[in-house]
Amino acid sequence: MLPRFLTASYPMERHYFMVPKFALSLIGFYPEQKRTVLVKLWSFFNFFILTYGCYAEAYYGIHYIPINIATALDALCPVASSILSLVKMVAIWWYQDELRSLIERVRFLTEQQKSKRKLGYKKRFYTLATQLTFLLLCCGFCTSTSYSVRHLIDNILRRTHGKDWIYETPFKMMFPDLLLRLPLYPITYILVHWHGYITVVCFVGADGFFLGFCLYFTVLLLCLQDDVCDLLEVENIEKSPSEAEEARIVREMEKLVDRHNEVAELTERLSGVMVEITLAHFVTSSLIIGTSVVDILLFSGLGIIVYVVYTCAVGVEIFLYCLGGSHIMEACSNLARSTFSSHWYGHSVRVQKMTLLMVARAQRVLTIKIPFFSPSLETLTSILRFTGSLIALAKSVI
């Protein structure tokens, strides 16, 4: 039984970017959040913790490469996600005004769709966006928590066997000795643990924005498809509409063309905002998944569980990007097919031209444009194939 906020019975307006809003508000980076002095200080503190954590993890991993490759990979695997989350944090801050504008405009456009069928589209895709981003949040939370649990269980087992407690942090990081000794060690441990959660909420927020916008654009395209088909519907194809009726259809058709143009413009704006995040994610995804699978092969006991959960979290991340892109492309194709299958040929030449123009525009599928990649399920299969090649190469070397 799912919690109510993950079901279609939950109010739709509260589904709108619910999980990204919750995640980014925790660290003071949600675009619609009031930027008070306390929020600014809190967001800077979280930025500093994440930045220093990335440096300390990378330093530790590079230092241990010639000493112990398994220990080095134990640090370098999570640092890739941490650096990626830092990129996402900076991008969200840099584009906060544009993101706020997009959030407000898409909210306004979706609120205009009020028919029973359109409300069904909204309920379906709003709920899907919340469910998938919450799944990502759960995977990320479990991954970050598993690192701390692993360290605590390892040390508890050491104590039961009469050995000393190892003063290390949940994530392998290089710190001055003073910070790894009592009385400062508990504070260092808590801050490193919080660093893991900052990493999680950053990628949940950014990935949730991407998936949410893609699914909300899909809703707008489906609603546009219904309006076009309803407008062009003709009861008797042999009977020509009156001049007044044709004039009304032309006016309504112009509004629909403008709506289609605006969705295309919003997609372009989203591409500009998400280009750095999406490119970095697609470039590093194979490396991150491959490294985590290699860690599964190298570790035993609790280490395997940690990296199985980690692999699931990274896999869900890249799946959300590809799923969102596929939904937009499919909605565009359906719009073109449905418009061409309507009764456009029963109207005046001007209406026919406008209809065929919309068909031509819809056939140029809307995508989130990033260099070298196009988010889609086909791209996901290519990434997984390349990941398999990296794993095979790593196994042969190690």
Swiss-Prot record:
Not expressed in either the antenna or maxillary palp. Residues 32-46, 96-124, 221-269, 317-398 are extracellular. Residues 1-14, 68-74, 146-199, 291-295 are cytoplasmic. GO terms for cellular component: cation channel complex; dendrite membrane; membrane; plasma membrane. Keywords: Cell membrane, Membrane, Olfaction, Receptor, Sensory transduction, Transducer, Transmembrane, Transmembrane helix. It is a multi-pass membrane protein. It is found in: Cell membrane. Pfam families: 7tm_6. One of its GO terms (molecular function) is odorant binding. The chain crosses the membrane at residues 15-31, 47-67, 75-95, 125-145, 200-220, 270-290, 296-316. GO terms for biological process: detection of chemical stimulus involved in sensory perception of smell; sensory perception of smell; signal transduction. Its main location: membrane. It comes from the Eukaryota. Belongs to the insect chemoreceptor superfamily. Heteromeric odorant receptor channel (TC 1.A.69) family. Or1a subfamily. The atypical heteromeric and topological design of the odorant receptors appears to be an insect-specific solution for odor recognition, making the OR/Orco complex an attractive target for the development of highly selective insect repellents to disrupt olfactory-mediated host-seeking behaviors of insect disease vectors. Odor-evoked OR currents are independent of known G-protein-coupled second messenger pathways. Odorant receptor which mediates acceptance or avoidance behavior, depending on its substrates. The odorant receptor repertoire encodes a large collection of odor stimuli that vary widely in identity, intensity, and duration. May form a complex with Orco to form odorant-sensing units, providing sensitive and prolonged odorant signaling and calcium permeability. Involved in the behavioral responses to pentanol, hexanol, octanol, nonanol, propyl acetate, butyl acetate, isoamyl acetate, methyl caproate, anisole, heptanal, 2-heptanone, r-carvone, and nonanoic acid. Also responds to pyrazines. Interacts with Orco. Complexes exist early in the endomembrane system in olfactory sensory neurons (OSNs), coupling these complexes to the conserved ciliary trafficking pathway. This is Odorant receptor 24a.
